[in-house]
């Protein structure tokens, strides 16, 4: 037996970040703490390095080991890959040693094909859910593995919504989603020149390769340069059995922090969407509800979640940023990591952890990054001016501070205008990881959709850039570079 490249969650622990990546090590640690984690395995960072050494292929030895671990997963879950009785569906997610929000790619619902969708539709008596999973999988796989842009699929969804006279994805029925899945496959064939893969093993290897490949994508390289992350580290891949937040109204998904990442105040801070999958919250596609509302909707899962938060914060002795899913009222933990926070919050959290007896004063001092102290001197609005002014719109204060600049609508324009010495505010429907360089060039960021845990919010807080998200009163006209708000029109350069 050669080198070991694959580890079950039960075989790892939180100290193995270099080998299992941050997400893999924390999934293993949560498993060891007895928390409800959907089981799976992690392919190590060494397999990523090997992939690049072998000329960007996964060698037969590593492929065989991965399939051996799929068999172990089948035994644990009692489900089988590509089976028509009880199919195993998995998520494939990246996990580098250092947290890189939005940089690396995720694929959910892997293992589906037309036959399997029919089976799970009948078995669950929930065809809407089955086809929703499939269309999401085709969309993610096409985007992440085959690099067919998201926008083609978004356009098809928007067309379908317009045809049905609805505004939200959730309002589309089973037949609409089935039709979308077929349109997506046709789009895939038109762009790639081959049929969408039906074989789960082929899908799995394609997805794993895509994660390894994304370690080298332009976004990831920009983020690494800014945050001093060595290229040689590589990324791990987590393959995990799916927990479904999109099976109906007794399901949902959310992202939460054990303390407020903007102020540092103690208490659950986060967001939740019913009948949704994880990507929906983070991608900021629908604007979610506050975590406190979860208590009314899912009292059992909420109670369990509060317990889990307490266990994790005491265990890691730091504020945690967690992703979770509720499937038919039952809680599943998908991720935990030390949460990104503003400099103000970092100061308050460090002091509070000392008061709560979790950290010594020496440890608390080391928790503050000296480079962040300057953001405590962030521009703030003049208190008198604020009282005198009439606000034209309201959104969520996702990242603190005050900013003023000229309006731009794309990341490219933000960079170009900054290069000319202009100060700009980037206005977007929602930001995506591709916008990171434009976000860096901006004084502030304003988005129409998305919440406090959306991509824009998390990245802006990390950069110390002022950000207002989810300002839904804005009517956007991206094509003509203008938007209206409070009865006025605003154009590029205003």
Map each language-model feature to its residues.
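Nucleotide/phosphate-binding sheet-loop regions of phosphoryl- and nucleotidyl-transfer enzymes
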Residues: 1-389, 422-425, 432-437, 443, ...
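Conserved structured catalytic cores and adjacent interaction surfaces
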Residues: 394, 398-493
